[in-house]
């Protein structure tokens, strides 16, 4: 089956996350491992499941992919530049959401959450575009990976 069976986030050199960011990371990893679709499209690529390591190195997002038994499957680097504005917008709306949960009525929280989901969907769409030809992922997998990119980008 073509999916991610293990994920590691390389936070070496990044500041410690806030409790909210750590919670976002934990939820995204849990949800991702519960259900995801991840395929390496080139015909000579080993089949999954895959172990994925995400890192930021030299201002680039690094996907390091191994097979379940540890054999190298692929590695590719994506520029962070196309993600910067969407990540920034996502964290701004997340801050508003975290504040709203503490003091606003449910109707206002729902409005902020809808905006947050919209930005999240945009980030997922952008990630799917950037991965074209490198990896094929479904929308839910893209959303969860985008969350992890945001977590990494926050500290970078």
Swiss-Prot record:
Coiled coil: none annotated. Disulfide bonds: none annotated. InterPro entries: UCP032146. Belongs to the UPF0262 family. HAMAP family: UPF0262. This is UPF0262 protein Jann_2882. It comes from Jannaschia sp. (strain CCS1). The lineage of its organism: Bacteria, Pseudomonadati, Pseudomonadota, Alphaproteobacteria, Rhodobacterales.
